[in-house]
C-alpha cells in the first residue's frame, strides 16, 4: 500500500497541529510521502500565511513599508520551530527571503508559505525535503508537463523512502516559480499520487469529509461516506468546498481513490471519492449544494427555433466579453443565459444592448438576485419521479422556480430561485430526500 498524504492549512497552523500530523503519519508506514499547505488560521480571527504573503507582495509593488507584515510572518514560523525544538536556521532563511523581496515576483513570494512549512515539517518528521520547484514542471501555457513531472517525481521517490513536499507551486522550463489557483495544494497532492500511481490519496483537513448539505443551513446533515468523482465535481462546482475541484482530475485519470479525513478527529471515517461505487446508496440523492449571486438574461424571438445559429450569435457576443455561462435553459421561442453577477458587474447593460442591436430579438429581459441549487445523485436516474418529487416539494412550500436545468446523465437537477429563498430551498430538498426517508 502506497499513499500520498496531504495536510491542509488548518492541519499545520501551529506546533500543536504539527504534533497531530506526526502522530497520523507515524501511525501508518504507507504514509511515506507528505504534502503540506502553508499554515492556516489558528482561530477565526487569525490570518492565513498565504494571505499575509499576498499582502506582503502588495506592499512590495506599491513600495510601502512592510515591516509589520514581515514580523507577523516571522513570528508565526519561528513559534512553530521553537515550540517543536527544531534546529534548522530558519531565521537566516527568513532574513534572506525578506531582503530579496524586490527581486522576486508574486508567485515566488506567495509560494514561500508552503516552502517554509515543508522545511519545518521535514525536519520534524525526520524526512527529506523535496522542493516542488524541482519536480512539478509547468509548460509555458501553465498546464502540467506530465512527462517531465512524472520522471522527476519518480526519481525523487527512488532516491528517498520518505519526503515532505510543499504544495501550491512548481516551476516552468525557465526555472520560474508558477503557482496553482488558491487551494492548489490539493492539486499538488493529486499530481504526486498520479505520478507514482499511489493506491490512495489522503487529504487531511479540519472536517470529517463531505456532508449532504451545508451545516450552516441544515442542522446536523448526514455524512457522505462514499461519492464518485463526477458527483464531487458537480457539488464542488456549486460551492461544496472541502477539496479543490481541480484535484480530482489527476487522481481520476489513474482511478486513485481520494480519502478526505479530519486531522483533529483521525478516528472518523471521512469521505472516500472514487470512480464508481458498488451497492445501493442510503438515499436517492448524494448531496445538495448551491450558490447565490446570479443573473439571467432572457432572449425571446418568435420562431427562433426556425432560425439557424440564433443562439450561437447571442453566445458569441457573451464570449466577446469573456463571460462564463452557467446554464442555458431554452424553449421553442426563447432561451436564457445564466451568468454570475461577479462576471458582469460593469458590462451587463453594454452586453444586453449589443444583443438587442445586433441580434434583433423581440425582447430581452434581465433578472438578478438569482440563486442556483443543485441536487446531485448517481442513482437519481434509476429512481423514477425524483425530479417530480423535488419540484412538488418546492411548490408545496411556496418556492417559485425561475429556472430548471438537468444534465443528460440525470445526475444533477439544478433549480434557480430567488436569493431570499436559498436557505429554505436547501432545507426543503434535504427534508424531502433525507429527513423523511429516515423515518
Stretches found by the model and what they are:
Residues 1-243, 248, 416-418, 437:
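Nucleotide/pyrophosphate-binding catalytic subdomain
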Residues 2-3, 31-34, 108, 127-128, ...:
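Structural motif
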Residues 12, 42-43, 137, 171-173, ...:
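Flexible loop/turn segments at secondary-structure boundaries
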Residues 36-55, 211, 260-277, 332, ...:
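Terminal amphipathic helices with adjacent charged low-complexity linkers/tails
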Residues 244, 255-262:
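Acidic/polar loop patches that form or flank catalytic/metal-binding clefts of enzymes
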Residues 269-439:
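A conserved regulatory-domain signal marking ACT and ACT-like small-molecule sensing domains
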